Amino acid sequence: MQGHPDVINYLVTLLKGELAARDQYFIHSRMYEDWGLTKLYERINHEMEEETQHADALMRRILMLEGTPDMRADDLEVGSTVPEMIEADLKLEYKVRGALCKGIELCELHKDYISRDILRAQLADTEEDHTYWLEKQQGLIKAIGLENYLQSQM
């Protein structure tokens, strides 16, 4: 099925962002695991798996629309401390949210309602799961202090 070139190109852009999110969560999850922060490892590993699912859905849609996926991920921001890692992941989620909103508008403009629905589902996941959880972690660190937070994540 031939898709609109603008939609395909934007889906490719979104794919690169999802691949970056996957890779950033991957390295952060393994760092948490190495540091013995098991709860953070489990949560961020789960986020990595969800970003992989997002990338898969975009890739499948690009192929269905007769486009060519670009598997080169956007740049990563790898933190070196837990607060830096949470901040980097949150910045990435804010960026993804903005890109998804633009993509939804573009899909509606070109009457590609299936792609729009895929992006809307990813937007809901980004806002209601990923972003919300990361913001909550920042609030916990502020409320109980970093040492107590880290102890709670072992």
From Swiss-Prot:
Binding site for Fe cation 1: 18, 51, 54, 127
One BP term from GO: intracellular iron ion homeostasis
GO CC, one annotated term: cytosol
Localization (cell): Cytoplasm
Annotated positions binding Fe cation 2: 51, 93, 127, 130
EC class name: oxidoreductase
The EC number(s) this enzyme carries: 1.16.3.1
All residue ranges annotated as the Ferritin-like diiron domain in the record: 1-145
Keywords noted in UniProt: Cytoplasm, Ion transport, Iron, Iron storage, Iron transport, Metal-binding, Oxidoreductase, Transport
SUPFAM superfamilies for this protein: Ferritin-like (SSF47240)
UniProt keyword Iron present: yes
Family: Belongs to the bacterioferritin family.
Complex formation: Homooligomer of 24 subunits, arranged as 12 dimers, that are packed together to form an approximately spherical molecule with a central cavity, in which large amounts of iron can be deposited.
Protein name (Swiss-Prot/TrEMBL): Bacterial ferritin
Taxonomic source organism: Pseudomonas putida
Gene designation: ftnA
